[in-house]
UniProtKB/Swiss-Prot annotation:
<dbReference type="GO" id="GO:0005737">
    <property type="term" value="C:cytoplasm"/>
</dbReference>
<comment type="similarity">
    <text>Belongs to the DDIT4 family.</text>
</comment>
<dbReference type="Pfam" id="PF07809">
    <property type="entry name" value="RTP801_C"/>
</dbReference>
<comment type="function">
    <text>Inhibits cell growth by regulating the TOR signaling pathway upstream of the tsc1-tsc2 complex and downstream of akt1.</text>
</comment>
<dbReference type="InterPro" id="IPR038281">
    <property type="entry name" value="RTP801-like_C_sf"/>
</dbReference>
<dbReference type="GO" id="GO:0009968">
    <property type="term" value="P:negative regulation of signal transduction"/>
</dbReference>
<keyword id="KW-0963">Cytoplasm</keyword>
<protein>
    <recommendedName>
        <fullName>DNA damage-inducible transcript 4-like protein</fullName>
    </recommendedName>
</protein>
<dbReference type="InterPro" id="IPR012918">
    <property type="entry name" value="RTP801-like"/>
</dbReference>
Length: 206
């Protein structure tokens, strides 16, 4: 008598192919790696309520010189988070985006402070957000931020996030829909005044 796999395994027990077993093991291994990295925020959606609480907590720890800068800082942080969240679903096409816990708050504070001395302040900024996947290669556009659409921009600001290339290279491209991307703590700001012929000013932050 020849038994089918269903009879060998018994009634009510699902049949799992060898490929399914391998995929499941890889998924579990990937989850263990991501959960062990406690220096990074791991979210399926970086706009979850828990993530917003972490942002607010990091903002509370900042010592802003005045109330106005604090309000601008909070608003800019949320706009950067929104930009990254939208890019996660569109241009990045990843399910999980890992980033250092204070990265967005740090970037937002530097963006606000870069507007000091500008004719319209932060309201005159046109902000472009990029991702640097590899040094020397073309930057990937993630989105744009316009603090006040009613104001004609007086300066352009490029925010360049950097991809962590050590983000499990053997695993991150196995699952197209489950791709995991991780950002480094370092970033770059490039400021160009639109009313001046001066060369852009580049700041690297570690």
């Amino acid at each position: 008598m020849v038994y089918t796999p269903a009879l060998v395994l018994g009634h009510g027990i699902p049949i799992v192919s060898e490929e399914d077993n391998i995929v499941e093991l890889m998924r579990k291994f990937l989850c263990q790696i991501t959960s062990s990295d406690n220096k990074y925020v791991r979210r399926g959606s970086i706009e979850s309520s828990e993530f917003i609480k972490e942002i607010n907590s990091s903002l509370d720890s900042e010592t802003a010189p005045d109330c106005e800068e604090r309000i601008l800082h909070q608003d800019m942080t949320r706009q950067i988070v929104r930009c990254l969240s939208e890019a996660k679903e569109s241009s990045l096409r990843c399910r999980i985006l890992l980033l250092p816990r204070t990265l967005t708050a740090n970037v937002a504070l530097d963006v606000v402070r870069s507007s000091a001395g500008e004719p319209c302040g932060l309201r005159g900024a046109f902000i472009q957000v990029y991702l640097e996947t590899q040094l020397g290669q073309q930057l990937q556009m993630l989105g744009t931020i316009t603090p006040d659409p009613t104001v004609t921009p007086t300066f352009e600001l490029s925010v360049v996030f950097k991809l962590d290339k050590d983000c499990w290279p053997l695993l991150k491209h196995i699952f197209v829909t489950d791709k995991v991307l991780k950002l480094r703590p370092q970033y770059r700001l490039v400021k160009k005044k639109l009313y001046s012929s001066a060369s852009p000013v580049i700041h690297e932050f570690c």
